[in-house]
Each structure stands twice: as structure tokens, then as C-alpha cells.
Amino acid sequence: WIMGHMVNKIEQINEFLDLGANSIEVDIAFDELGYPEYTYHGVPCDCKRYCTKSEKIDDFIEALSAATTPGNPKFRKELTLVVFDLKTGGFDASRMYKSGKAFAELIQFSYWKGSDDAGRAYIVLSLPKLDHYEFIKAFREHFDTSTFKNLLEERVGYDFSGNEDMGLTRVVLDKAGVNDREHVWQGDGITNCILRSLDRVKAAVAIRDSATGYINKVYFWTIQAYSSVRDALNAEVDGIMTNEPDVIANILKEDAFKDRFRLATYRDNPWETFKR
């Protein structure tokens, strides 16, 4: 998956897809009560990027739903996966559960439109800290009594992006009601302004490939330097989050990679662990 980073304006959806992305990451900002309010990252962010682009949440989710609904004039078949980078550090932790419920309602009614046929992209809920796990728990429990529980079970995955201990991550996912390999993505990375080793990525890949692991997919963020991308691919990641999707698309055509990797399509299940 080529994961377009920090796609927070409606026009950026097509911009990143046109550059070769088949996935986007969207930053979700919340009000002080934990209700989703805007798409917004804020400063600091990545080098050579504007950090303050924003849309009202309802407007962006409406556009995102259109872009991922077959038959809609704005449908883009390339967009198969959306990572919601949930900025849950801006409100009191006591509101985490209610915030997760509110975001579940947003997805159900504004993205899926209360229908099996709208908003088909797979979704990853990405939390910045392990102690925010009640957001995931609440999101999942919202659908326990819903006729749309099948969409939760088919289309929603989970990630913690704070580079915390992976053994503890497994424990916390269990607390949130998420079983081993139940749609678990594991990210590792840092701003593109700083070089980061692949040690933790390789550790995550080893867990992914272990018979007793809990991870389905591993991705690295945020890179676009050719050497860094090649190194990440050689480490066997499943996704790369980037500001320059065309760089990754070009590298995938190189002799060293063209027979080892291909761009994921909607037929490729992001919850299945790939076996070579």
C-alpha cells in the first residue's frame, strides 16, 4: 500500500491518488469534549509540507464517501484503504470512550451512509497512545447492537502509532476487545525531517511472520528518499506512508522489486497476513 500522508483537504484526495497512492492518511482533530471536528494536523509536521490544511469533518467525510462509492461520479477505484490518524491527545482521557462512540456514528452515518453499498474503503483507526485504547473499545461496542456490525467485522482495522512497546500493544489490543491478527496494523516511524533506523520495523515484521504473532500488516512512515524506500521494501513492509507517492510507485517498477511487490487493489484483503 502506498499511503499518502496528511491528506486533509478534499482536493488532496485526487492529488495523492493521481501521484500513485492507493491509500490515504487523514488527520482527525477533536473538540475539547472529544467530538470529531476537523481534518487537521497542525505544527510541527513534515519537512516541505503545509501543516495547517483543514476541512470541516462532515465535508471531508462526505467527499471521502463519494470517492469510495462505486457508481458515484467521483469514485476512485484506486482508493482502497484509509488510515484515520486520530488526534486524541487534545481532550480529557475521561472522554475517550464517548469520543470513540461519536466517531463510530460518524463512520456509520456519514461515511457508510447507513448502507452496505457506500464508502467501501477499508479503514484503519490509528491511535497515538496505548492508553487511549478505550476509543477502539467504544467504536467496536457501538456496533454490537447495530445492523452494520458486518461492516465493522469486514472493513475496520486498528493501529497504535506512538512507537510504544509491542508486547504491551498486544495486551492493550486485547483490553480493547481486539484479538491477535484481528485486523491489526503496526506502524513505525517518525517525521521525514529525521532519519530513523529500521530496527523496530524489522521487529514488527518478525512478529507478523511468527506463528504466534498478533500483527497482520506492518507499515513505515514518513519517507520518500529513494534509499529509505528501498531499505523499507527490503525489510518486507506491507505499506509505506509518504508525501511523494510517485517515488514509491517508481521504485516498485525497478528490477529489484517489480517481481516481489505489486500495488494492492481492492481484492487484496488488508487484514490477511501475506505469505511468500
Curated annotation (Swiss-Prot):
Positions of disulphide bridges: 45-51, 47-193
Provide the residue positions that the database annotates as binding Mg(2+): 25, 27, 85
Query: What are its cofactors?
Result: Mg(2+)
Q: Which GO terms describe its molecular function?
A: lyase activity; metal ion binding; phosphoric diester hydrolase activity; toxin activity
Q: In which tissues is it expressed?
A: Expressed by the venom gland.
Q: Name one GO biological process term.
A: lipid catabolic process
Q: Catalytic activity annotated for this protein?
A: an N-(acyl)-sphingosylphosphocholine = an N-(acyl)-sphingosyl-1,3-cyclic phosphate + choline; an N-(acyl)-sphingosylphosphoethanolamine = an N-(acyl)-sphingosyl-1,3-cyclic phosphate + ethanolamine; a 1-acyl-sn-glycero-3-phosphocholine = a 1-acyl-sn-glycero-2,3-cyclic phosphate + choline; a 1-acyl-sn-glycero-3-phosphoethanolamine = a 1-acyl-sn-glycero-2,3-cyclic phosphate + ethanolamine
List the catalytic residues: 5, 41 (nucleophile)
One GO cellular component assignment for this chain's record is:
extracellular region
Location in or out of the cell: Secreted
Tell me the cofactor note: Binds 1 Mg(2+) ion per subunit.
UniProt EC number: 4.6.1.-
* Keywords carried by this UniProt record: Cytolysis, Dermonecrotic toxin, Disulfide bond, Hemolysis, Lipid degradation, Lipid metabolism, Lyase, Magnesium, Metal-binding, Secreted, Toxin
What is the annotated role of this protein in its UniProt record?
Dermonecrotic toxins cleave the phosphodiester linkage between the phosphate and headgroup of certain phospholipids (sphingolipid and lysolipid substrates), forming an alcohol (often choline) and a cyclic phosphate. This toxin acts on sphingomyelin (SM). It may also act on ceramide phosphoethanolamine (CPE), lysophosphatidylcholine (LPC) and lysophosphatidylethanolamine (LPE), but not on lysophosphatidylserine (LPS), and lysophosphatidylglycerol (LPG). It acts by transphosphatidylation, releasing exclusively cyclic phosphate products as second products.
Homology family: Belongs to the arthropod phospholipase D family. Class II subfamily.
Q: What is this protein called?
A: Dermonecrotic toxin LlSicTox-alphaIV2iii
